[in-house]
């Protein structure tokens, strides 16, 4: 069978099979029941799959003379390695967590601050040994807790010891079915609890001794925070905040309104350090070195100047990653840059899909859970599609456009391809699609690449000599232009268009299709394109919830989808829960006029049906008599059925889970946040539903 399939595969693309199986192993581990994610079962899993991977690799090497067996065994090893590394990551972060809310006095070292400029700050604190919850053996010393506060905005105390009284809760489970599991991400970051501050924050003497590596990390964090604060003070709003995001990856100074404008215009990717920024910093430096070398041809021709320039560019790129705090997007970009540098040093083709796969392998090997993050998916989707386009363009030869049109046409093509490749992932993680992103990026990318980032490099260097005030006005002008562009595009119709997420099944089918289209020879590659279309069809026909019910640890809070792409909340929602509801339903959420719903009110669904929402018991009688509605949703327990036979669904008892609500005529279906589905029977119904 292997010999029959082998001629259909493009030889240099075989690495796609390995990457696909490696990711499949990671996904399989995360699909396992929770019992396999902690304790002795997790230890067994790690042991079995690590040994299996090692033994399989040994056998594959021993039998390498038999090509078919060797390749099959190697693919098996890659698959088991995905499971082994994913389970090992969880085993290394298998620490005790609180099981319920606790109030305690804590102290520890402040290691990070994030949030938005106009919202509450979030403090990341490494617990000290004298904290109440540590002395009572609730949480271990060194564990991280995240707490929010509106009384702390100064970042200069990163690394300092602080004390406060807090209310802590366990890391959240999956909020809604089909949504990211933030609890697992918190786990791999050693975050054991989250909550909020309920007292004043006080500074404490810092008398602890740490390792050299810890001191280096602390120095970089303090530098990043201090430089970001300096940029904010140096430039007017919002230019200083945008500069901090571009140069050192500190986005907490950006207000929510400014970020929303960038997101709706399709320019939010410019605020996260990624391949664009790394390419400008790294290879821009290499170009400058080669330019000055070209001024002295007699000397520069005596040695391989381009290779020395590549090495210097790699060092500069590494410094940029450290300055930015090494987020996934920056690590991916730096990994790609290093592969390009290695290709230059070995006189090989640099931009290849193989190098993209190697960078993905490297990141996922060290952080398997990154596979499920928006940063990883968006950055690799954009990078892969651009490299695929570049390789196909290189095979076709130079473009036939006039030289003055080549750069604009290439920019338009790259922007279009990037927008198409990232749209499903943006919809999955953010619930929005930006039709005008192509227009915004045609202007925004050259503005960032040719003006803002080069001036930013000069500004960073000039800060060392106290001359940043000379360069700041020039960078401010470029940043203002970028902000005005985002503001202008965000005002267009359908900018930031709310859509329902495609779901992981559709994403898997589409990714599989893209890989097959690049793996197989041309006639068979159409199978992959067909799978991409099928994945889009799965997205199109995926049922969209008619509402959500948040009931974990709280009184049930009902949100129902409405007409004109606007959902209504029949209880006050936190900003976080509102964003989760909007993402899952693909609609904006507004607070209903609760005064009109006392004791009852009418809700219209986009399906053409209506329901009565009953908030008080005395509203049941009027709701039963309303002939224009199909059923009743009540937050109070009914004592009698409707004489008309209208179904009454009691949501007051639906506690302990968050639910997706699906309504089909008079049928009422709930899916909890763990994926368990059931049809709900009307209250007081005399016969089974």
Predicted segments, located by residue:
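Hydrophobic alpha-helical segments
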Residues: 1-37, 343-344, 458-469, 476, ...
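Membrane-interface helix/helix-cap signal primarily in integral membrane proteins
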Residues: 2-9, 63-269, 637-642, 649-688
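Hydrophobic alpha-helical transmembrane segments in multi-pass membrane proteins
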Residues: 8, 17, 25, 70-72, ...
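Divalent metal-coordination and catalytic microenvironments
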Residues: 25, 108, 166, 246, ...
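Membrane-helix interface and helix-disruption motif detector
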Residues: 33-45, 66-68, 439, 496-500
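Non-globular, low-confidence helical/coil segments that flank catalytic cores
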Residues: 37-38, 133, 151-167, 178, ...
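Hydrophobic core of alpha-helical transmembrane segments in multi-pass integral membrane proteins
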Residues: 44-61, 80-85, 507-518, 531-538
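Membrane-interface amphipathic/re-entrant loop segments adjacent to transmembrane helices
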Residues: 203-219, 225, 260, 264, ...
């Amino acid at each position: 069978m292997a010999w029959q399939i082998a001629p259909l595969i493009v030889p240099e693309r075989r690495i796609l099979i390995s990457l696909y199986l490696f990711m499949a192993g990671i996904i399989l581990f995360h699909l396992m029941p929770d019992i396999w994610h902690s304790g002795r079962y997790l230890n067994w899993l790690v042991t079995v799959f690590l040994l299996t991977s090692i033994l399989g690799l040994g056998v594959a090497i021993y039998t390498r003379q038999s090509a078919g067996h060797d390749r099959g065994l190697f693919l098996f090893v890659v698959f088991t390695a995905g499971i082994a590394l994913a389970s090992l990551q969880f085993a290394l972060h298998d620490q005790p967590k609180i099981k319920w809310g606790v109030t305690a006095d804590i102290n520890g070292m402040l290691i990070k601050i994030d949030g938005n400029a106009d919202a509450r700050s979030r403090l990341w604190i490494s617990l000290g040994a004298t904290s109440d919850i540590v002395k009572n053996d609730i949480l271990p010393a060194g564990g991280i807790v995240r707490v929010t506060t509106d009384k702390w905005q100064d970042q200069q105390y990163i690394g300092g010891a602080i004390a406060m009284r807090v209310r802590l809760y366990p890391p959240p489970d999956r909020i809604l079915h089909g949504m990211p599991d933030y609890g697992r991400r918190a786990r791999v970051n050693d975050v054991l609890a989250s909550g909020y501050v309920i007292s004043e924050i006080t500074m404490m003497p810092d008398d602890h001794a740490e390792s050299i590596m810890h001191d280096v990390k602390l120095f970089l964090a303090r530098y990043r925070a201090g430089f970001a604060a300096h940029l904010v003070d140096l430039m007017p709003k919002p230019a200083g905040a945008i500069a901090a995001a571009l140069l050192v990856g500190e986005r907490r100074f950006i207000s929510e309104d400014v970020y929303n404008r960038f997101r709706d215009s399709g320019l939010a990717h410019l605020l996260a350090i990624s391949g664009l920024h790394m390419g400008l910093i790294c290879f821009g430096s290499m170009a400058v070195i080669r330019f000055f070398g070209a001024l002295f041809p007699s000397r520069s021709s005596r040695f391989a100047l381009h290779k020395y320039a590549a090495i210097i560019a790699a060092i500069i790129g590494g410094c940029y990653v450290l300055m930015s705090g090494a987020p996934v997007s920056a690590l991916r970009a730096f990994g790609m840059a290093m592969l390009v540098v290695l290709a230059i040093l070995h006189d090989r083709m640099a931009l290849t899909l193989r190098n993209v796969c190697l960078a993905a392998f490297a990141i996922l090997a060290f952080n398997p859970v990154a596979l499920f993050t928006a940063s990883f998916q968006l950055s690799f989707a954009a990078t892969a599609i651009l490299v695929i386009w570049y390789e196909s363009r290189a095979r076709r030869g130079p473009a036939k456009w006039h030289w003055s049109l080549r750069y604009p046409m290439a920019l338009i093509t790259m922007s279009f391809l990037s927008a198409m490749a990232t749209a499903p992932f943006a919809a999955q993680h953010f619930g929005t699609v930006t039709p005008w992103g192509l227009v915004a990026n045609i202007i925004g990318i050259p503005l960032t690449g040719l003006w803002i980032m080069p001036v930013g490099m000069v500004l960073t260097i000039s800060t060392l000599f106290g001359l940043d005030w000379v360069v700041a006005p020039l960078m401010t002008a470029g940043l203002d232009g970028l902000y005005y562009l985002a503001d202008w595009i965000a005002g267009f119709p359908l900018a930031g268009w709310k859509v329902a997420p495609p779901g992981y099944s559709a994403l898997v089918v589409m990714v599989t299709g893209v890989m097959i289209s690049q793996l197989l020879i041309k006639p068979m590659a159409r199978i992959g394109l067909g799978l991409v279309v099928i994945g889009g069809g799965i997205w199109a026909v995926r049922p969209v919830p008619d509402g959500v019910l948040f009931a974990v640890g709280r009184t049930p809070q009902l949100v129902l989808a409405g007409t004109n792409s606007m959902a209504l909340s029949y209880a006050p929602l936190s900003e976080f829960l509102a964003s989760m509801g909007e993402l899952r339903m693909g609609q904006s959420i507004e607070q209903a006029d609760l005064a009109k719903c006392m004791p009852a009110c009418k809700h219209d669904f986009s399906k053409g049906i209506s329901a009565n929402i009953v908030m008080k018991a005395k509203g049941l009688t009027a709701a039963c008599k309303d002939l224009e509605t199909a059923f009743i949703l009540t937050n109070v327990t009914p004592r009698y059925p409707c004489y008309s036979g209208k179904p009454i669904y009691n949501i007051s008892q639906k506690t302990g889970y968050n639910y997706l609500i699906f309504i089909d005529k008079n049928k009422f279906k709930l899916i909890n946040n763990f994926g368990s589905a059931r049809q709900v029977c009307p209250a007081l119904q005399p016969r089974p539903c």
